[in-house]
């Protein structure tokens, strides 16, 4: 679905056209004191809305942690307290993260970050139903400080014929009040409206006996706020209030009721592998440590900020992923910050098609042993430290099935550059970031490199290519039959829980998620992603997909082998015996499955030998360079 972040969804013909201060009136819902007067405006009200209160409540819960949707200056909001005990705090997420991975529980935050909620005010006719304390986290902590905020939820249900409702209709009301933890207006950061408190009120006149998301009733959403005494209302604040109201309505249109605690807009493929706050905190640290210098010294023809910050975001994810899998931590945390101070717990990485080498550089600087290769040397390599340059190789990957096929015809021709067949060291973690021709090869090369213990990997697809290297658009995956007894593997990592009964809400939720996936997989990028997943699963990988928080629309990460490797590494650390299995049989099975997939996928290009010839010819062109706009990565 297209993003209409800035689209106006309100009926602007109902607005007065006057400056907001001229339209203010006392709030009839929130009563203040002689020095605290809540106000609202008819220009801050939108009526005729079809959403039942449950939709607004669901959306409000979702926005509690995803405040970045309302402000580009913010990363997120961390939940510090929930009176219902439903939303997890960062400490609770870290503890769960440590228990399922190889992170030591002792390395998580020692104690809960306790912030007492502001006492809730009584609101006539309403019942207080929930209190949440959150901390707003800015994108630039050196410019803006975090801010705690108490959120109070109130509800009212007025029966037909009661005061405030008509004889025929029931009035249901939902009120959310947000109060920052500040002693004066000078403490309010730039990203927060200069207000003492802000409230959303949603009134729904329900004419239907049974509620639906678009029932026969009608709703009205209004904003109420508590300004500072004698403080003028600047134009910026007026724009902010209108934008907040508009965003709430726009998002409500796409909100589907959900049984999840995070709200109906929650994406099950986002933050499902690593907690959001861990990755973003690490990203902030890396950005301030490396971002400025890398952008300043950039020598490529491409835009530096896009590539630098994307690579730093991926690096942050990898650091936290490896913390979970291996118990490996950055050099700063080991008091060994500096070149070539590698964590002995980490087995090493290889960045295939490493491009500008920034990912390799930062990972090495952070204390993770590894190297990268690309078919063509980049100008950026020469500005990196010498020890990093030594680990960036100008080499072409020729898959072993191709070298074996060409061996019968005199071997691989001289390409004028070193070649290799991907025989990486045991336990090496493979990074395949926008590797184009190598994307679908990634799980295959990981298995062929070490069939007795296939290597773990992450692939971030970009441009679509066949195994021959030729550009190819994969067809969308076939939809599973409705009466199929087994669940389609492509959805296992999206939602592993199936409705235990014929509950309509649960069935509806499953149907919506399936429809969302179908739409994604019909695209070229979605079909490529699914192809990488299906190949990996076919040859024995337990695959997870996760939406990475990177500045790119090609942001789906396909992770293979994480769970198995995490379990194996935990057993090693605890000096437990390895699981009893027939190693030769496992190796032979993995090789057979990989070769069967290679032969099938290469059949469209004349078999393995024909695909090998295409691969070599394309590799020559990539090595020589094809001019700006046609090089790898310019899809």
Swiss-Prot record:
GO terms for biological process: tRNA methylation. Residues 1-28, 474-509 are annotated as: Disordered. Keywords: Cytoplasm, Methyltransferase, S-adenosyl-L-methionine, Transferase, tRNA processing. Residues 480-493 have a biased composition (Basic and acidic residues). InterPro entries: tRNA_uracil_MeTrfase. It catalyses: uridine(44) in tRNA(Ser) + S-adenosyl-L-methionine = 2'-O-methyluridine(44) in tRNA(Ser) + S-adenosyl-L-homocysteine + H(+). Its EC number is 2.1.1.211. It comes from the Eukaryota. GO terms for molecular function: tRNA(Ser) (uridine(44)-2'-O-)-methyltransferase activity. Its main location: cytoplasm. Disulfide bonds: none annotated. The keyword S-adenosyl-L-methionine applies. The keyword Secreted does not apply. GO terms for cellular component: cytoplasm. It is found in: Cytoplasm. Probable adenosyl-L-methionine (AdoMet)-dependent tRNA (uracil-O(2)-)-methyltransferase. Belongs to the TRM44 family. This is tRNA (uracil-O(2)-)-methyltransferase. It comes from Aspergillus oryzae (strain ATCC 42149 / RIB 40) (Yellow koji mold). The lineage of its organism: Eukaryota, Fungi, Dikarya, Ascomycota, Pezizomycotina. The gene is trm44.
